[in-house]
């Protein structure tokens, strides 16, 4: 079981697995709030998603509507001083072309924002496999991969090939300096990067 030290004076760019404005805050939100309160500069990047659901999925239109509302907020500052941003992306990840377009779009947008906000040598905290293409592109000092789901098994939320999601997940495991699992079962089933893997269980933040 890992207890994260509370440090200060660092820069953190977190690619969350969901939008900051989601009605049920996830563990990444609580962690980033604590880091910001401790005196760290934090940028939280709203979910760049695993792709949109299929056209037949009833969640397609609500997902698009929620994402458009996030885009409308642009870069916003929370009460804790966290910069929350929804970068423009192409919502399809099944092809090399679309992934290349996305990581270039995001690299430019987040890189410029980090420079304006004074972030240097950030800790890159990724909580979704599609952020793996950003590793090595934001001048980061450390890469943390926060695993909170079996991403390739969650096919209800997107139409992307599970095999592609699995490949991205395995790349993230191979390239991360530190891997945090939010569940004991997820950690028990892990096969890659075990020497860098730790359990960070979710809890209620009062």
What function would you assign to each model-found segment?
Residues 5-6, 50-121:
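A conserved catalytic-core segment of Leloir-type glycosyltransferases
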Residues 1-67:
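N-terminal subdomain of nucleotide-sugar transferases
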Residues 29, 103-107, 123-138:
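An aromatic- and histidine-rich active-site surface loop
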């Amino acid at each position: 079981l890992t207890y994260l030290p509370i440090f200060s004076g660092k820069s953190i760019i977190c690619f969350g697995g969901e939008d900051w404005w989601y009605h049920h805050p996830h563990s990444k939100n609580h962690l980033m709030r604590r880091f910001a309160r401790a005196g760290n500069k934090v940028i939280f990047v709203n979910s760049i998603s695993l792709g949109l659901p299929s056209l037949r999925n009833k969640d397609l239109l609500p997902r698009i509507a929620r994402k458009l509302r996030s885009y409308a907020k642009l870069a916003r500052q929370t009460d804790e001083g966290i910069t929350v941003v929804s970068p423009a992306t192409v919502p399809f990840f099944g092809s090399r072309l679309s992934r290349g377009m996305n990581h270039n779009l995001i690299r430019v947008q987040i890189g410029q924002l980090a420079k304006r906000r004074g972030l240097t040598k950030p800790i890159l905290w990724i909580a979704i496999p599609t952020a793996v293409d950003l590793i090595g592109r934001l001048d980061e000092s450390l890469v943390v991969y926060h695993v909170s789901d079996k991403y390739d098994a969650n096919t209800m939320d997107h139409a992307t090939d599970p095999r592609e999601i699995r490949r991205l997940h395995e790349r993230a495991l191979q390239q991360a300096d530190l891997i945090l699992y939010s569940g004991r079962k997820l950690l028990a089933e892990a096969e890659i990067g075990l020497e860098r893997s730790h359990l960070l269980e979710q809890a209620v933040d009062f």
